[in-house]
């Protein structure tokens, strides 16, 4: 039997659980670290660590693909990561950023339709509408209304992530670690420049950062990016992305639970309903993509 059609076995499901736990913990450890390090500078430190770890392993892209690779790095490394950590810093909770970030999946479907001419059926269209409606419902939760700018920043971050994932489809010959390595290498200097401009005193404040701040940046690079994405890459070599994606929706669910149990989140009815709509819509998009053998955007985290 073809492994891609056989579904995920027990060992692969354990890998999925490790990935989801690694990505969910990233929300918690990053939120703690962002209390000590400004978000853009934190993102730059994460990418510095990642660049140092991967620079010896990156492969050059094929001829003519350097501009595309730089565009992907700016979308994913600078704007997605930078804005998502800024959103997490402002939010004061883990639940809403973890859920809203998943809206990049319907956004990527729309961008693939617009840029690449990919078509989707009415069921996928309904799933996209349900996801976006869920963001609106979630936005009226009292916990979210305390910092509406956080919701807006995460939505903009998701737009850049969707754009980056669609552009990545045009890259060829690069493995996941080369993509991550180049994203880190190209992203560091713009983020440092943005931090110097928008976060005055951020560099000087690093002398007061404790192991919580530095450890959060290290975990974000090693635990979330290297471990989480490394295992994810192993899975998608064996199974279609659309087959793996539904299982990875456990990650935002675990992040919400960590937010409630550890971080002190108190989500209201609107967040539970809106969150279910967002994740339900993403699940339907993944299931329709699997049924129609249509490409899915790769799973991402902050």
Regions found by a protein language model. Give the residues of each.
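Hydrophobic alpha-helical transmembrane segments of multi-pass integral membrane proteins
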Residues: 10-15, 41-56, 71, 126-130, ...
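Hydrophobic/aromatic residues within transmembrane alpha-helices
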Residues: 33, 42, 87, 114-116, ...
């Amino acid at each position: 039997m073809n492994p891609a059609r056989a579904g995920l076995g027990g060992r692969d499901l354990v890998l999925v659980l490790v990935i989801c736990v690694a990505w969910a913990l990233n929300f918690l450890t990053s939120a703690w670290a962002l209390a000590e390090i400004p978000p853009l500078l934190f993102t730059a430190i994460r990418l510095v660590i990642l660049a140092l770890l991967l620079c010896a392993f990156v492969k050059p892209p094929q001829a003519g693909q350097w501009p595309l690779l730089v565009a992907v790095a700016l979308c994913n490394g600078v704007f997605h990561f930078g804005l998502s950590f800024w959103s997490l810093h402002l939010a004061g909770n883990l639940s809403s950023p973890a859920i809203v970030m998943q809206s990049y999946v319907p956004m990527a479907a729309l961008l693939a339709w617009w840029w690449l001419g990919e078509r989707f059926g009415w069921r996928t269209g309904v799933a996209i509408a349900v996801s976006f409606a869920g963001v609106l419902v979630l936005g009226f939760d009292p916990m979210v209304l305390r910092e509406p700018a956080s919701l807006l920043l995460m939505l903009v971050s998701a737009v850049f992530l969707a754009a980056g994932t669609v552009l990545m489809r045009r890259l060829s010959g690069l493995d996941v670690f080369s993509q991550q390595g180049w994203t880190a290498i190209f992203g560091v200097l713009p983020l440092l420049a943005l931090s110097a401009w928008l976060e005055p005193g951020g560099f000087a404040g690093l002398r007061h950062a404790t192991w919580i701040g530095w450890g959060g940046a290290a975990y974000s690079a090693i635990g979330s990016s290297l471990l989480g994405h490394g295992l994810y890459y192993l899975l998608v070599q064996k199974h279609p992305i659309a087959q793996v994606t539904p299982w990875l929706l456990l990650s935002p669910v675990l992040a919400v639970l960590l937010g409630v149990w550890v971080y002190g989140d108190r989500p209201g009815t609107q967040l539970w309903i809106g969150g279910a709509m967002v994740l339900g819509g993403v699940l339907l998009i993944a299931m329709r993509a699997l049924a129609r053998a249509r490409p899915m955007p790769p799973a991402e985290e902050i």
